[in-house]
Every structure is written in C-alpha cells, then in structure tokens.
C-alpha cells in the first residue's frame, strides 16, 4: 500500500470516527428524551447523569481493552473467536492460583497473562506459518480454552475475596450527581484509556503499525516490499493475548468471582465494538479511537435498553443487527469510494488523451 493510499484511508478513518461519535450522541439523546417524556417525566434523566455515563464506561472497559487487541489482529487481516473463553481461562487461572495454590497475587496475574500470550502466539504461529484460516484455528482455541479452564477449577467458581479491590474501588470520594446517584471512578477505566492511547500511537506513528496496515491491505504486496508478513501476523496475536489478559484481570476485579461464564460470548461484544468502530473485516482499515467509541456505543445501547426496561433478549437482537448494519454500511461506503476512484481515473485518462490529441494536432 502506497503512502498516498494510506493517507487517504487514514482521512476516511477520521470521518468514520465522527460518524460513530454522532451515532453515540444521537442514541443518548433519543433515550434521554424518551425517559423525560414517558418514563420519568419531571425528573433529571438518569441516562445523561454523570453516574450513569461513568457506569457505561465501567461496563465496557474490559470489553474495550480486549477490543484493542482485536483491532490489531483484524487490521492485519485476522480474527480471533477465542477471546471470550481465553478471558474465562485467565480469570479462573488467576483466582485458582491465588486462592487455592497460594501464589502471590502479582505472580498469579503475571502467570495467567503470560499463558494467554503463549496460547495466542501458538495460534498465531499456526495461522501465519501453516496458512490456516484464522476462523477455524481460533474456533478450535475457543473450545480448547473452555475445556482447560473447566479442568483447572473442576467446573467450580472461585472467589477472589476482594483481592483485586484496588482496581475496583473508586479513586474519588463518594459524590452524588444531579440524579442522586453516587459517581464511581475505578482505576481500570484509566487502564482502558491508556491501552487505547498506546495502540493508537503504535498504529499511527510506528513502522510496526504501518506494517500491520500493509499486511492487512495486501499481504502479497507487503511481502514484495520486504515486510516479514508471517512475523507481523504472529506478533498481532501475541499482543492480543497480552491485551486480553489485562482485560480479563480488569473484568475479574469488577466481578470478584471467576466462573466459566465470565468471558462467555465476550468475543461477540469485542468483534462488534471493532466492526462498529470502523475495522474492516477484510483488514487494512481502522483505528483505535473508532473502536474506543464503538465499545462505548455498545455499552450505551445495552444501558439504554435497560433504562427503557426492555428484555435482555432484545439486547442480543440489537447487537446482531448492529454488527450486520455496520458491515453493510462499510461495504456500501467502500463500493462508493471505489466507484468514485474509478470515475476519477477515467476522467483523468480522458483528459490526458484529449491533451495528447491537441499536441499531435
């Protein structure tokens, strides 16, 4: 991919980020109006209360962290269906090693994260070296991680007994917002923001980030340009393991108890956040801030549906429709862009032909 093409795509990323942002603001505004008119008329709408907005960020932080790892994997042209069960494994292994095996907390956390990196690296090696479809390998990984996690804890849940409360407890004194709700600001929110900034910086400003885009856009062209495509793909899965491990620890801090369902179906939310945030399923396109907004939008939709007292089943319907809508919208936008480029190229060719004819005359 040429530098000009890369710059053009990055310009479209910014436009895509604005679109997600405006959809987020529009959704919050609609829920707020409905709440003011029909649910709680005459009172401050909880949807826009500082406490509720912070709760949305709290709810999506772990998913958003994991989505940053998925961002790099998908930009490089891959996908990972195993992140949900890998999350359960990391949570269960951490809790089991700390509570039952008496590991120091730091050792338990580091060991669990390193295992996540190892497992993801193994899948990345198979995908990059043996040319196996990521969908198949990560689907197998999902099943394998589930089985290993169940074996470790014998299908039981394990409580952390508040050992991770330092990541969960609010860093500010109790303060009530206009809706009378207490504002909670746990530290793992800042972990989410910090990882987003790091991934954004790596993708935007480093040679490694440019290689990820190049591999995702056209692996063959990247190879001919001297990029080690296999190592780039392998490294994105290894980094994904690291980031998923961190996200799993943050999630464990929030829920306190590790169980096999801790990460169940988490991959749906992670992939949805990435796709809504502008990551192309075909690779080579997207950025971290778009995914950041996509994760928050997913959380806002779930939160808004709870405020409207809709059944939880409708949340799955909404998530599925959102993913389908995001993919269709991206495909339509890409087709329109390709058509405009083709028309511009044809116009340029005609103008050059007319100029050559005048010179000959």
Regions found by a protein language model. Give the residues of each.
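Transmembrane alpha-helical segments in multi-pass inner-membrane proteins
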Residues: 244, 254-320
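Cytosolic-side transmembrane-helix boundaries in multi-pass membrane proteins
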Residues: 1-33, 37, 217, 224-231, ...
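Structural signal for alpha-helical transmembrane segments and their membrane-water exit/capping regions
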Residues: 26-45, 76, 152, 200-207
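Helix-loop-helix "hairpin" substructures at the membrane interface of multi-pass membrane proteins
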Residues: 103-109, 118-123, 127, 175-258
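Single transmembrane alpha-helix segments in multi-pass membrane proteins
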Residues: 29-36, 49-101, 126-132, 274, ...
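Hydrophobic core segments of alpha-helical transmembrane domains in multi-pass membrane transport
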Residues: 21-36, 70, 113, 146-147, ...
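Transmembrane helix-bundle core of multi-pass membrane transporters
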Residues: 134-208, 232-235, 255-260, 341-361
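Alpha-helical transmembrane segments within multi-pass membrane transporters and channels
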Residues: 102-143, 293
């Amino acid at each position: 991919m040429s530098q000009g093409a890369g710059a053009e795509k990055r310009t479209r990323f910014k436009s895509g980020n604005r679109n997600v942002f405006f959809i987020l603001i529009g959704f919050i505004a609609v829920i707020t109006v409905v709440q003011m008119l029909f649910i709680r008329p005459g009172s401050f709408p909880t949807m826009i209360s500082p406490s509720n907005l912070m709760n949305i960020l709290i709810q999506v932080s772990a998913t958003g962290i994991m989505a940053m790892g998925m961002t790099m994997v998908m930009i490089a042209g891959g996908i990972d269906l195993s992140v949900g069960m890998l999350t359960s494994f990391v949570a269960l292994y951490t809790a089991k090693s700390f509570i039952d095996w008496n590991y120091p907390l730091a050792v338990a956390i580091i060991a669990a994260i390193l295992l996540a990196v190892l497992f993801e690296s193994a899948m990345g090696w198979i995908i990059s070296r043996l040319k196996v479809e990521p969908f198949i390998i990560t689907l197998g990984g999902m099943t394998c991680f589930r089985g290993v996690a169940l074996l470790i804890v014998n299908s039981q849940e394990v409580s952390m007994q508040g050992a991770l409360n330092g990541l969960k407890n609010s860093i500010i004194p109790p303060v009530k917002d206009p809706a009378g709700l207490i504002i909670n600001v746990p530290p793992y929110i800042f972990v989410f923001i910090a990882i987003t900034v790091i991934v954004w910086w790596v993708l935007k400003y480093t040679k490694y980030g440019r290689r990820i885009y190049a591999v995702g856009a056209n692996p063959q062209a990247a190879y001919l340009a001297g990029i080690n495509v296999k190592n780039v793909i392998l490294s994105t899965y290894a980094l994904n393991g690291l980031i998923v491990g961190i996200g799993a620890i943050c999630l464990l801090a929030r829920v306190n108890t590790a169980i096999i369902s801790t990460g169940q179906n988490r991959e749906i939310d992670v992939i949805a956040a990435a796709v809504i945030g502008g990551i192309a399923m075909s690779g080579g396109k997207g950025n971290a801030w778009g995914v950041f907004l996509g994760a928050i939008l997913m959380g806002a939709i779930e939160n808004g549906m709870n405020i409207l007292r809709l059944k939880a089943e409708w949340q799955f319907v909404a998530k599925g429709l959102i993913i389908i809508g995001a993919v269709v919208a991206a495909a339509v936008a890409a087709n329109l862009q390709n058509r405009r480029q083709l028309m511009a190229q044809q116009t340029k060719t005609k103008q050059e032909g007319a100029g050559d004819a005048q010179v000959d005359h």
